[in-house]
Amino acid sequence: MSLNPRDVVIVDFGRTPMGRSKGGMHRNTRAEDMSAHLISKLLERNTKVDPAEVEDVIWGCVNQTLEQGWNIARMASLMTQIPHTSAGQTVSRLCGSSMSALHTAAQAIMTGNGDVFVVGGVEHMGHVSMMHGVDPNPHMSLYAAKASGMMGLTAEMLGKMHGITREQQDAFGVRSHQLAHKATVEGKFKDEIIPMQGYDENGFLKTFDYDETIRPETTLESLAALKPAFNPKGGTVTAGTSSQITDGASCMIVMSAQRAQDLGIQPLAVIRSMAVAGVDPAIMGYGPVPATQKALKRAGLGINDIDFFELNEAFAAQALPVLKDLKVLDKMNEKVNLHGGAIALGHPFGCSGARISGTLLNVMKQNGGTFGVATMCIGLGQGISTVFERV
């Protein structure tokens, strides 16, 4: 494959083990420290990349307050081998933040505004709760349905509109845990998880090289016993079919194809197209459909050209309608989230976009795929998608 000099290539990807937010492995680790550790280790294993060449550290983070405030990208960068002469910015597109970080870096490379970037994101939902410091404008209800800010209710709405049953959602939830457990046992996450020290349930310091969020014992029967989490009267969305509240970080090294060639680096993949799209906030989970359609059109590809998909599992009731309308539901077991998803691994907001992108690249590498799509819904009615080609 011949690449143009300003094509954007992914050099490497790594992530932390995913930790439970309540009493989990990262309970005594700050978000900046988690981010800095990840960046440092990823640079250490890429010896051909000079940290001094990093133009910018672009880091996704949603709740930018407390330890995640005051530009956590810069805070984390200062604690790594990246020199002070490199810059840092923190971005938020809610759930799509670290994929937006990737897009921002890609756009800079494409326009000649830098050659080497470190991108990713973090969310420590155990230290900085989802609603900490949030003060929604009550006037918003004049412009969008009042429940649009309640993600679980938007999932209920989307599931109802598309005829998604409780049983279908439970089966999807079981699948996520089973596939994530299988990937763990078979070492499929080995290339992407960068071990971190943390504390086990007994308070002992240990090195974690696995996700503590996966529940292999999950069954259809155990999920069927759960009560609705958001709509007690007739609701179908439960805690077991929703993304977990977890702590984690993800990181990528991206650069221009020309710089990768000059350094003698074999990239993992090249970005073929990117897109964002908006939808009615009341069905925010539908965002991946128009975003993916737009990205595919820009890449000159059709849905059948895509070998593998990573779709962020915000809710089973949201993921299934997306797969249905993208016309890949019948190919789910061959193409979609083959290592499980956020129902098993969790959804640390600022982390997830780069996490699903990196997991996709590993799935493509392990299974020989050529084209892949990473996509996710975004609170208040957006979608974001990236089309990758393996090189």
UniProtKB/Swiss-Prot annotation:
Q: List the disulfide bonds.
A: none
Q: Which InterPro entries match?
A: FadA, Thiolase, Thiolase-like, Thiolase-like_sf_Thiolase, Thiolase_acyl_enz_int_AS, Thiolase_AS, Thiolase_C, Thiolase_CS
- Provide the reaction this enzyme catalyses: an acyl-CoA + acetyl-CoA = a 3-oxoacyl-CoA + CoA
Q: Which family, according to UniProt?
A: Belongs to the thiolase-like superfamily. Thiolase family.
Instruction: Please give the name of this protein.
Output: 3-ketoacyl-CoA thiolase
Instruction: From the UniProt annotation, give the residues forming the signal peptide.
Output: none
Q: Which PANTHER family match?
A: 3-KETOACYL-COA THIOLASE FADA (PTHR43853:SF11), 3-KETOACYL-COA THIOLASE, PEROXISOMAL (PTHR43853)
Tell me one GO biological process term: fatty acid beta-oxidation
Query: Where is the catalytic site?
Result: C95, H347, C377
The protein's job, in short, is: Catalyzes the final step of fatty acid oxidation in which acetyl-CoA is released and the CoA ester of a fatty acid two carbons shorter is formed.
Q: Which PROSITE patterns match?
A: THIOLASE_1, THIOLASE_2, THIOLASE_3
A Pfam family of the record is Thiolase_N
Q: In which pathway does it act?
A: Lipid metabolism; fatty acid beta-oxidation
Q: Which GO terms describe its molecular function?
A: acetyl-CoA C-acyltransferase activity
What EC number(s) are associated with this protein in UniProt? 2.3.1.16
The protein's location, in the record's own words, is: Cytoplasm
Swiss-Prot/TrEMBL keywords:
Acyltransferase, Cytoplasm, Fatty acid metabolism, Lipid degradation, Lipid metabolism, Transferase
- Predominant localisation class: cytoplasm
A GO cellular component annotated for this chain's UniProt record is: cytoplasm
